[in-house]
Amino acid sequence: MSMLDMARYVKELEDEEVKVLRAFARMLREHESLDEESIAINARMHIDRVRYALKRLNEKNLIYKSPSKGYHLVYAGLDVLALKELAGRGVIAGVGRMIGIGKEADVLEAVDDNGRMLAVKFFRIGRVSFRSVARKRMMKD
């Protein structure tokens, strides 16, 4: 997903979509996938509103609907939620281009209300670490 898409989604997200993304983020540590009912309970929303928000988030590719396991939060959804939170707190006013993509994090330009340039770093916890791959390969030899 491009930075332009993510910036647009930060502006376009409805309150209910943000509540659902926040529920995903809260429950992410304990659950890989979530069903509609658990999201509704955690977000304190009516199930019909949750279904509507999930449909919209899935169309934007911020979550993934598995045919059998329920809904999964993807990196783009977590990134958009983080940018929304930073913008809501007044930390950033806008985002720019991608500065770099590393093995464990992505970094992008941002600007605050005073025009100061900032860098926003997204850690990719699930990304394969080269060090761990090398260690495992050495153990097999």
Would you name each region that the model predicts?
Residues 13-42:
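Short amphipathic alpha-helical interface segments
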Residues 56:
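Alpha-helical DNA-recognition elements
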Residues 9, 28, 39, 66, ...:
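Generic anion/oxyanion-binding catalytic loop in active/binding sites
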Residues 4-8, 48-51, 60, 64, ...:
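Conserved ATP-binding subdomain of kinase catalytic cores across diverse folds
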Residues 1-21, 49:
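Short alpha-helical segments that sit at the start of domains
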Residues 10-17, 67-86:
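Short, cationic-aromatic polyanion-contact patches
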